[in-house]
A protein has these predicted regions:
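Intrinsic disorder/low-structure terminal segments
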Residues: 1, 6, 53-55
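Bacterial Sec-dependent N-terminal signal peptides
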Residues: 2-4, 14-41
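Low-complexity, glycine/proline/serine-enriched flexible coil segments
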Residues: 9-11
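First exposed extracellular module after export/assembly in secreted or surface-exposed proteins
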Residues: 30-200
Length: 200
């Protein structure tokens, strides 16, 4: 009788061990907290505090890979392949960029806080194909432990009329936080969006 009980207990332990191993070998589902599939830019004219919100739906998210973007303004007004942000010459604007996970429309997660918490591992870079706009970190921006601005909040100063293509990147683990082009920063790309800035 005791031998039988001992055998059953041993068999049960083996079964539980095998089940545990199977669970460990099963790949974990993608963590929803790592998904960044929507970017929002709020543009505020510093002279009168008027603002406009621009939404960019990112179709795919994959470190270091190209992915498609569907740009939309607040009124779903699309201009060709790019969203157009209208700016006045000789003016100053505040650009606030945020990153969301809207996989579940009923539970939209603001991922910007996670980016801030990992500020040493992230950097926002705007690459402009043209002249007429100067960009700098602005009040309310996040500064990393080395004194580098994250560029979540920036001031755009316009000068002359221009139509400028803009690419905005959220860079993960950049090797440098200074540069003029995306390649200067190294690391991988968490998010990439495109729009046109029209200065008139």
């Amino acid at each position: 009788m005791l031998k039988n009980i001992y055998f059953k207990a041993t068999l049960l332990s083996i079964v539980l061990l095998l089940i545990s191993c199977d669970k460990d070998d099963t790949p974990e589902a993608e963590n929803e907290m790592e998904v960044l599939n929507k970017t929002v830019i709020v543009v505020t004219n510093l002279s009168d505090d008027s603002s406009e919100t621009y939404n960019f739906e990112v179709e795919e998210h994959d470190h270091g890979q190209d992915h498609s973007v569907l740009p939309q303004t607040q009124d779903d007004d699309e201009h060709g392949d790019h969203t157009v942000i209208e700016l006045k010459s000789g003016s100053e604007y505040k650009f606030e960029i945020s990153f969301l996970n809207d996989t579940d429309p009923n539970n939209i997660i603001d991922m910007t806080l996670e980016v801030i918490n990992e500020k040493d591992e992230h950097h926002v870079h705007y690459e402009l194909a043209g002249n007429g706009i100067e960009i700098e970190s602005y009040s309310g921006d996040t500064i990393d432990s080395n004194g580098n601005a994250l560029n979540l909040v920036t001031k755009w100063t316009t000068s002359t009329s221009a139509e400028i293509e803009v690419e905005a990147y959220l860079i993960h683990q950049p090797t440098s936080k200074t540069g003029n082009t995306r390649d200067d920063f190294g690391g991988s790309t968490d998010v990439e969006i495109e729009f046109e800035a029209h200065v008139e």
